[in-house]
């Protein structure tokens, strides 16, 4: 178990401090699967890290005999991610995000403005429930070399919808910054694993889409996650072989 209090102004990213004071309590505990392969774990993790909300991480490797038993200690679904705040347990990425928005209103988890928040929540829910073809064809692998694969019409349809959604959010709400709603928010956290999929599977995208992807991949929190993923000893051959 490791504590995170990220000073995201520091560089290089592999020196981001883990609980540098050594004695301050960290109230939140985020339970994750392998960083190399878990898209759902990244979503709350990058939100917590980028918004500088202190937390501890507990990694329970996937595809191990003890995986489900370990995850059941923290969530009744036996899946990751889940969040512990003292005696309060929260599971599922969107539920964790909404809990953080309520617990840390000063952190602007969702965009400011009623219309922007409604749009951001809609996009986050669409991501949570949709884009099945892309997710099945291009499984998450944060240390995969950049290499193209054949894509079906269904996958290309998912990509087209994602590009349109990002472009509309940027044009309507994102003029104040590099992210979907200007400042980094939960909507960006929900789509962060998609950025990785489009990048490592070398999917052809517009210049505008690529600029947004580069903004996400330039985040210190993103770089810290990728560094951790590459350092993990665990391998899942069925994903690495794609």
Show which residues each predicted segment covers.
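Extreme N-terminal basic, low-complexity initiation segments
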Residues: 2-8
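GST-like domain detector, emphasizing the conserved glutathione-binding G-site
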Residues: 6, 15-151
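Short, contiguous strand/loop micro-motifs
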Residues: 30-32, 58, 182, 199-200, ...
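Tryptophan-centric aromatic hotspots in well-structured domains and transmembrane helices
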Residues: 40, 91, 110, 159, ...
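Short, solvent-exposed turn/loop segments enriched in Gly/Ser/Thr/Pro and often Arg
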Residues: 61, 186, 229
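GST-like fold's C-terminal all-alpha helical module
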Residues: 127, 131-218
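Long hydrophobic alpha-helical segments typical of transmembrane helices together
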Residues: 209-242
């Amino acid at each position: 178990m490791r504590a995170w209090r990220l000073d995201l102004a520091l560089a290089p990213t592999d020196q981001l401090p883990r609980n540098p004071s050594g004695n301050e309590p960290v109230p939140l505990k985020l339970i994750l699967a392998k960083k190399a392969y878990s898209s759902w774990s990244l979503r709350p993790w990058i939100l917590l890290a980028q918004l500088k909300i202190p937390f501890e991480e507990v990694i329970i490797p996937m595809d191990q005999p003890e995986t489900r038993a370990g995850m059941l200690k923290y969530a009744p679904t036996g899946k990751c991610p889940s969040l512990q705040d003292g005696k309060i347990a929260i599971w599922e990425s969107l539920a964790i995000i909404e809990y953080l928005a309520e617990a840390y209103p000063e952190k602007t988890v969702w965009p400011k403005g009623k219309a922007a928040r409604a749009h951001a929540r809609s996009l986050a829910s669409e991501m949570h429930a949709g884009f099945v073809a892309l997710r099945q064809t291009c499984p998450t692998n944060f240390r995969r070399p950049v290499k193209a694969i054949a894509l079906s019409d269904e996958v290309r349809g998912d990509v087209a919808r994602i590009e349109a959604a990002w472009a509309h959010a940027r044009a309507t709400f994102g003029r104040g910054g590099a992210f979907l709603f200007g400042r980094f928010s939960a909507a960006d956290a929900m789509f962060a694993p998609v950025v990785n999929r489009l990048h490592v599977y070398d999917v052809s995208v517009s210049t505008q889409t690529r600029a947004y992807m580069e903004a996400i991949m330039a985040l210190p929190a993103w770089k810290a996650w990728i560094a951790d993923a590459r350092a993990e000893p665990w391998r899942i051959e069925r994903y690495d072989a794609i």
